[in-house]
Design a protein with these regions (language model features):
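Loop/turn-rich, solvent-exposed surfaces of beta-rich toroidal or solenoidal domains
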Residues: 91-162, 168-171
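Structural signature of eukaryotic scaffold interfaces centered on beta-propeller domains
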Residues: 30-54, 92-105, 155-162, 208
């Protein structure tokens, strides 16, 4: 495993944090297996996130998520988690910044310990959160496509991607099955009618108004 020596310098107070408590740039998830509790899996988490022309710093070992000023390289705190990730209770999950739009912060509460039974990893405790920058509300989002209303879908936000949009990957074979079952409507139905089951996935771009 490649390791880098990293320190955090407070430009205003001059204090230096050795960050010795940062074990890795990846989230280490402990997977419990019957008869073998020493096995671990590793989930890669992006530390620097570019969204809408801005850059954000969200290390999973830190309680604070920052926006970076490109001109001064200053760090401006935007979100603070409680309890601390270094507390026994707070250490049960990692908080990840997944994306930013003009109005929302998209977050993921990733549980730090997973159960694995019969070679199947079970993760039913991790969940997504959205912070409304206008109202200060925090809620768990549910996304549905009006052309595929029976299916709840997950999103992907690309680092340095286009401002105020998310992406969804739709497998061609799944769209063909949904088409045959009469679950598709509108533009998505038209797209599915022109697909073969072994075609490449369809990438849908969702723009926030």
């Amino acid at each position: 495993v490649y390791k880098r020596q990293i320190m955090l310098l407070d430009k205003s107070g001059g204090n230096i944090d050795s960050l010795q408590y940062v074990k890795t740039w990846d989230a280490s998830l402990s997977i419990v297996i019957e008869g073998n509790e020493n096995m671990k899996a590793y989930l890669w988490c992006e530390v620097m996130l570019g969204q809408g022309g801005e850059t954000y710093l969200g290390d999973i070992a830190s309680d604070t998520i920052y926006r970076i000023n490109k001109k001064t390289n200053g760090l401006f705190p935007i979100l603070l988690r409680t309890p601390s990730v270094r507390d026994s209770e707070g250490g049960k999950y990692y908080l990840r910044l997944e994306g930013v739009t003009s109005r929302y912060y998209f977050l993921k509460c990733q549980i730090s310990s997973l159960d694995m039974t019969d070679m199947v990893i079970k993760d039913d405790k991790s969940y997504s959160l959205v912070y409304d920058r206008q109202t200060g509300e925090i809620f768990r989002p549910t996304f549905r496509n009006k052309d595929f209303p029976s299916e709840e879908w997950s999103y992907t936000m690309r680092s340095n991607g286009e401002k105020d949009c998310v992406y969804q990957t739709l497998e061609s074979f799944a769209l063909k099955e949904a088409l045959e079952e009469g679950q598709l409507e509108g533009s998505l139905k038209t797209v599915a009618q022109g697909l073969d089951e072994d075609d490449n996935p369809v990438i849908m771009v969702v723009r926030f108004r």
